[in-house]
């Protein structure tokens, strides 16, 4: 049986998500799609939290990191989280075609 993790969101993740939501809703004029993306993101994070988040493949980075970054892919976006003791800390929400090495 795996340990239970608490969930924590960094302000940077919340900022990333808000910027994407605003872009889809206001620039692309598709608030329904923006809301669906938020819902899909919430569901994917909660699902990962309940399915032993350490059991998934980490993101391979050239940088030395104190904590491994794990990706969750949601449509054209990727959520990155780390595990710190009993906390799943959600750190970034980025467009999947961006250069992750410059963002995390």
Label for each model-derived stretch:
Residues 70-104:
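Enriched for short, Lys/Arg-rich terminal
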Residues 1-65:
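Basic, Lys/Arg-enriched alpha-helical interface segments
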């Amino acid at each position: 049986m795996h340990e239970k993790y608490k969930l924590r969101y960094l302000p940077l993740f919340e900022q990333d998500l808000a910027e994407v939501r605003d872009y889809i809703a206001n620039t692309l004029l598709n608030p329904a799609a923006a809301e669906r993306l938020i819902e899909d993101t919430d569901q994917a994070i909660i699902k990962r939290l309940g399915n032993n988040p350490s059991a998934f493949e980490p993101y391979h980075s050239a940088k030395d990191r104190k904590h491994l970054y794990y990706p969750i892919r949601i449509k054209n976006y990727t959520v990155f989280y780390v595990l710190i003791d009993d906390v799943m800390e959600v750190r970034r929400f980025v467009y999947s075609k961006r250069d992750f090495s410059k963002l995390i």
